[in-house]
Amino acid sequence: MYAIIQTGGKQYKVAEGDKIFVEKLNAEPGSIVTINEVLAVVKDGSIKAGNPYVEGAKVNLKVVRHGKGRKIIVFKYKPKKNYRRKYGHRQPFTEVIVEKIEA
């Protein structure tokens, strides 16, 4: 059994026990987060597709930790004008484990 969920503007294919990295969630590590935005559920070969979401379906995620991704360097440069700008960005994420899929 697996489900396709939407969180943080992205879609993820998840099964029970999966560990995934999602966009940062406002939840403490160790807490349970319920995702109601379930786009599809596949169980024993039968597919339930939502329009846009499957009614009554939800996925429980356990928050493991928060962190930051690897650093991305952005460098702007204009030749002959002595214009240089360098800055970095680290995208925050939340690591979660899929506890239960209810459909």
Curated annotation (Swiss-Prot):
Q: Which GO terms describe its biological process?
A: translation
Pfam family of the protein (one): Ribosomal_L21p
Q: Give the CC-aspect GO terms.
A: cytoplasm; ribonucleoprotein complex; ribosome
The record's InterPro entries line, in alphabetical order, gives: bL21-like, bL21-like_sf, Ribosomal_bL21, Ribosomal_bL21_CS
What superkingdom does the record give? Bacteria
Q: GO molecular-function annotation terms?
A: rRNA binding; structural constituent of ribosome
Keyword list (alphabetical) reads: Ribonucleoprotein, Ribosomal protein, RNA-binding, rRNA-binding
Q: Which family does it belong to?
A: Belongs to the bacterial ribosomal protein bL21 family.
The annotated subunit structure for this chain is:
Part of the 50S ribosomal subunit. Contacts protein L20.
Q: What does this protein do?
A: This protein binds to 23S rRNA in the presence of protein L20.
Q: This chain belongs to which protein, by name?
A: Large ribosomal subunit protein bL21
Which organism is this entry from?
A: Carboxydothermus hydrogenoformans (strain ATCC BAA-161 / DSM 6008 / Z-2901)
As recorded in Swiss-Prot or TrEMBL, the protein's gene is named rplU
